[in-house]
């Protein structure tokens, strides 16, 4: 990890109005940057290196943590895209406090109408975004359009029987939206029902025929590469410090990892690294 934030930097970030009103206002800021470094920036090294002429795009950047982590830890040029202009401005201010705002090209836009030229990014990241766009095939194709070499995607897996990102009710996300809403309300989970529409591995890959899966466990090159990220701070609601996965989860992950590139079909997260076919 690069030097910890100073007290002044942390206070300045938490004082940014858009960030200070959000659900992530109390996250561990150092831990958050470290999370994105260890879970996304460093694992890319198993597939490719980055030089100062390479462009990494962070699609749906939110408060910019992934873009900031790439700016802090690689020489690459970064493009950060978000459809919420106010949130993007907050991300730019966070990056400014950390001294890397000049390393990042901030653009307002959305999947399906991305403000990038064809193949402008060597690597495009889309982390926990496509579940919020419906099942827009054009939006996923747009991701393939802007990436000249690689795509890294994470999103809940439609095939998995429970989605923690949603209501967490078994099989509920397989139901039509009206029935999902009724079930969520009946179980006291209506506040977590956001009408997200999830993608299956088959449907996602069908929209990106020019790309093939190269990761063997989630978006990592191996199950071991995932394990060495622990212990780790997880900056999501309900996250916090994780020493390791639980026993049953660890056993399941170990078994599924034996499927190699096909493991994404059985994982709760449809996370994968894709490379353009030669």
Describe the role of every protein-language-model region.
Residues 1-118, 127, 140, 265-277:
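Conserved N-terminal segment of class I S-adenosyl-L-methionine
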Residues 68, 134-138, 163:
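Short N-terminal helix/helix-N-cap motif within the alpha/beta-hydrolase-1
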Residues 123-134:
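A short SAM/SAH-binding and catalytic strip from SAM-dependent methyltransferases
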Residues 137-151:
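A short glycine-rich, Lys/Arg-flanked "PGG" loop and its adjoining helix->strand segment in the class I
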Residues 152-179:
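Conserved class I S-adenosyl-L-methionine
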Residues 193-212:
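Short alpha-helix
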Residues 212-222:
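Conserved S-adenosyl-L-methionine
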Residues 244-271:
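Conserved Class I S-adenosyl-L-methionine
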